[in-house]
Every structure is written in structure tokens, then in C-alpha cells.
Design a protein with these regions (language model features):
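Conserved, well-structured functional cores that handle cations and Mg-NTP chemistry
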Residues: 1-193
Length: 193
């Protein structure tokens, strides 16, 4: 199957989902029992890249797109019969594979000064004011009246550009008590002698 002028997004998706992997997965999930007119890699591309932001697709529209991309003509029943629990499982496994592949590669690279570190973790806390009826459970730190406050503690990975942990505390909780250091941090430090 040949797409004209593939974009960067298509190239990225093609490296994450090679055609041979898609065919193997289709057989493994019983989406394809024997390959005839419905090709698993073509249906994958049509279902994933066949939608546009401002364009509403129908199943019939996807069928026409499939026929164009596969350069074949198929009957309506042959097309509609493919929308089965096996297709759902096939697409589900594709999503899991895609998430695993994206998690393998960090989104950012650290600068020269920080290249010896595996990751940089940033601790951030935000105070959210709550209704005064919650003051017993979430007392505020500095207040002359009865007030309630919630501290949202977030540890963010600079490399993955996403949260490592998220926790809720009373506003009175000290910052040092919100920092949870566990075994996950051991691989993040490198000692120099």
C-alpha cells in the first residue's frame, strides 16, 4: 500500500506499526482468519488516519476510502462484517503497543550539564481553597478565620514531560512531608568517586 507524500505523523506511525507486525497481530487476535480482500494493514491505516478534524466519516465513507487505498472493490456485506469484537481486540492491542512504544522513548533530551542524570524530577505544590465546612479535614495554614485548604502535590518528570506522582494533602502539610522518595528514585542518581 502506497500513500502519496507521507507526513511526519504518518512516518512515525509507520515505524511504530510496521505492516508485518499488523498482519501478525491480525492473525493472533483472529481479526483475519485468511487474507483475501480485507488487508489488516490497510484497514488499520483507513481507520486511524481516515478521519479528519472537520470531516465526519461514515462506515460507507471508510469503505470507499479502503477501496481507494487497497485498489479493490468489495461488497458492503464483506466490509460491514469486519466490524466485530475481533476488530476491537485488534485495535485495542494496537493502542497498547503504541503506548508502550511511545513510553520507551523520552520526549526530551537533557542539556550537556545534566546529561549524566537519567531524569530531572520537579516537585510542585498548589493550594486550592475549599469550603469552610471542610476545615476539620483540610485545615488552612495561615488564616484568621475558619478556612480549609488543599495542597495538590505533583512530581513532574522533565524528560517525560509528565507527572510521576500526584497526591492530595492538607494545606498545613510541610513540603518535606509531601515529597515521597521511594525505590523508583534509586536508578535516578549516579554517584561519582
Amino acid at each position: 500500500m502506497v500513500f502519496q507524500s507521507p507526513t511526519t505523523l504518518e512516518n512515525t506511525i509507520r515505524t511504530i506499526f510496521p505492516e508485518i507486525w499488523l498482519r501478525t497481530l491480525a492473525i493472533k487476535t483472529c481479526f483475519i482468519k485468511r487474507e483475501r480482500k480485507i488487508k489488516p494493514e490497510v484497514i488499520f491505516w483507513v481507520l486511524t488516519l481516515g478521519f479528519c478534524v472537520h470531516n465526519q466519516r461514515t462506515i460507507a465513507g471508510l469503505k470507499r476510502l479502503y477501496e481507494i487505498e487497497a485498489n479493490i472493490s468489495i461488497s458492503d456485506s464483506s466490509w460491514y462484517d469486519r466490524f466485530t469484537p475481533e476488530l476491537v481486540e485488534f485495535l485495542h492491542q494496537c493502542v497498547i503497543h503504541g503506548i508502550e512504544e511511545l513510553a520507551k522513548e523520552p520526549g526530551r533530551k537533557l542539556s550537556k550539564k545534566l546529561e549524566n542524570f537519567k531524569d530531572v524530577i520537579i516537585q510542585d505544590s498548589t493550594i486550592v481553597r475549599l469550603h469552610s465546612s471542610l476545615a476539620a479535614k483540610f485545615p488552612a495554614a495561615r488564616s484568621r478565620t475558619v478556612a480549609a485548604g488543599l495542597k495538590v502535590g505533583v512530581m513532574v518528570s522533565a524528560v517525560a514531560n509528565g507527572p510521576k506522582t500526584i497526591a492530595l494533602y492538607s494545606e498545613k502539610s510541610a513540603e518535606i512531608k509531601t515529597l515521597r522518595i521511594g525505590l523508583w528514585i534509586c536508578s535516578g542518581f549516579t554517584s561519582y568517586i
